[in-house]
Each structure stands twice: as structure tokens, then as C-alpha cells.
């Protein structure tokens, strides 16, 4: 049985048990029993930070504690100095930078009397940006002087040159209409008299459409656009395209003003 026992052959490959001096037992207070596998691991094993032998933790802890500058108070090493792995440089831990507030805390009364300077700068920037956006919309000096704010609200009224009184939004009410303030033959009228339709008698007798424009109004518009000027005015007009376009625009404005006058006249009659 002893020869065929597999445990006997497996134990024969291990070195014999290492004997210990039992005189050290009273100093350590316990007996040491070493296994053959632990003895094999202890032989020619490189040093590492991990202790594989649980019976040698006292010696390893003492060695690590002696090499640790943070745990050894007698080493004289400053705790603020950190060593790199290469031990080539010494890095000193600097204190963190303290960021001071730019504006100190002021009492409510002082803040009301003397507001911070940066608030004034922001208000000035907002004022400048509003002026820039105001100029970007194409407002001229006349627009800035007009403070009526009757059409565009807080952005003012945009004047369309000399034909601004012909705008539809300014002639909705006969009491405030600039066209109703002057007659068609007035010197204040910016349009020539020959461009205005003159057959107003037929317009008064005709029936009105649902849109508020009479049947004869549309015929008058077509006749006004096709109407040729007086012979005295033909010599003044040149054959240039620019003057032709200007004349066509004037005729369109004249027909539009004519319809606005009739619309205002009808509204004034209804209110009476």
C-alpha cells in the first residue's frame, strides 16, 4: 500500500520541512508552522508591495512604515513635498488661489445712492445697441422727429418720402387724414392737377361695390393711367426711361389718392 500511495510520491517532490528555533517562541508568543509550499515561494522571490506570506506581515509593515515619509514623523520630510516616481524632482504643493469678488458687498442705502459702475456700462451698451438696431431699419431724421407712434408702435413711423401722406394707414380716419386736409386742386398737393381724375360727377351717381370702391372708380383708374397729358406738358417730358417710370408711378399714386378721397368722403357721410 505504501508504494502505491499517490500522496507519498507527490510529497517526495517537495523539499523537507524547514526547522525553526523554538527559543523564539516566548518572544513572539506563538508557534510557527511553515508549509513546504510557503518555503518554495520564499526562495528567490522578487520583492513586491504585496505580501504573499501571511506570517511575515509584521516585518513587511515595519519596513514599509520606515520608508513612508508621511507615517514616519522622525524622518524630517515636509508633508507638503511630494516625491515623483523617478525621484528626479520635488514638487511642492502650493496653496490654492483665492479669488476675491470684484464688487464688495454694499449696504442697500449705499447701493441705491452709488450704483456699481458695471451696471452703468451695461445700460450704456443696451442704449447703444438699441440705437444701432433703430438705424438698421432705415429710419431717417424725419422718422426720428415724428413722435406720434401711430402706426409702428414703439418703433416710430416710417415716412415714405413725399408720398407718405398717400399711405393707406394714415388715411383710415377722415379727422386725421392728410389727404382730406387739402383739396385735390390745392397748392399743397404734391401731384400735378392733370394726373387727378376730373369726372367726379359720374362717380357720385354710380353704385358702390362691396369693397367700397365704385364701378366708375376702376374705369377712372384705367382712364387716368391711359390719359395723355396736355400738349404743353408733352414738350416737358423726355423720352428717357427714368422719366417714363416716374410718370407711371405718379399716375398710380394719383389713382390711389382718388380712391382714398372717395372712401373718406363716404365714411364722413355715414358718420353724419
Curated annotation (Swiss-Prot):
Q: Where are the transmembrane segments?
A: none
Give a yes or no for keyword Signal in this entry: no
Q: What is its main location?
A: cytoplasm
User: Which residue ranges have biased composition labelled Low complexity?
Assistant: 215-233
Keywords tagged on the record: Cytoplasm, Nucleus
One Pfam match = Pal1
Location of region: Disordered? 193-250
Any one Gene Ontology biological process term? clathrin-dependent endocytosis
Where does the protein end up? Cytoplasm; Nucleus
Q: List the GO cellular component terms.
A: cell division site; cell tip; cytoplasm; cytosol; nucleus
Compositional bias annotation for Polar residues: 235-248
Instruction: Report the family membership.
Output: Belongs to the pal1 family.
Annotated protein name in UniProt? Uncharacterized protein C6B1.03c
The scientific name of the source species is Schizosaccharomyces pombe (strain 972 / ATCC 24843) (Fission yeast)
Amino acid at each position: 500500500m505504501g508504494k502505491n500511495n499517490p500522496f507519498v510520491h507527490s510529497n517526495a517532490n517537495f523539499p523537507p520541512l524547514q526547522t525553526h528555533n523554538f527559543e523564539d517562541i516566548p518572544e513572539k508568543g506563538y508557534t510557527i508552522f511553515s508549509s513546504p509550499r510557503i518555503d518554495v515561494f520564499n526562495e528567490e522571490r522578487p520583492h513586491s508591495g504585496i505580501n504573499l506570506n501571511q506570517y511575515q506581515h509584521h516585518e513587511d509593515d515595519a519596513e514599509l512604515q520606515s520608508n513612508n515619509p508621511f507615517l514616519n514623523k522622525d524622518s524630517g520630510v515636509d508633508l507638503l513635498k511630494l516625491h515623483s516616481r523617478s525621484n528626479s524632482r520635488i514638487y511642492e504643493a502650493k496653496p490654492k488661489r483665492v479669488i476675491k469678488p470684484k464688487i464688495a458687498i454694499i449696504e442697500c442705502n449705499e447701493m441705491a445712492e452709488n450704483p456699481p459702475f458695471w451696471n452703468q456700462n451695461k445700460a450704456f451698451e443696451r442704449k447703444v445697441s438699441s440705437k444701432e438696431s433703430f438705424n438698421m431699419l432705415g429710419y431717417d431724421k424725419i422718422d426720428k422727429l415724428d413722435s406720434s407712434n401711430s402706426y409702428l408702435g414703439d418703433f416710430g413711423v416710417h415716412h415714405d418720402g413725399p408720398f407718405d401722406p398717400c399711405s393707406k394707414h394714415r388715411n383710415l380716419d377722415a379727422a386725421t387724414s392728410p389727404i382730406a386736409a387739402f383739396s385735390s386742386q390745392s397748392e399743397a398737393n404734391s401731384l400735378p392737377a392733370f394726373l387727378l381724375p376730373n369726372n367726379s360727377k359720374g362717380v357720385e351717381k354710380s353704385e358702390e361695390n362691396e369693397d367700397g370702391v365704385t364701378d366708375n372708380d376702376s374705369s377712372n383708374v384705367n382712364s387716368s393711367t391711359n390719359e395723355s397729358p396736355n400738349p404743353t406738358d408733352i414738350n416737358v417730358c423726355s423720352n428717357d426711361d427714368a422719366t417714363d417710370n416716374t410718370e407711371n408711378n405718379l399716375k398710380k399714386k394719383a389713382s390711389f389718392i382718388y380712391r382714398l378721397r372717395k372712401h373718406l368722403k363716404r365714411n364722413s357721410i355715414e358718420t353724419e
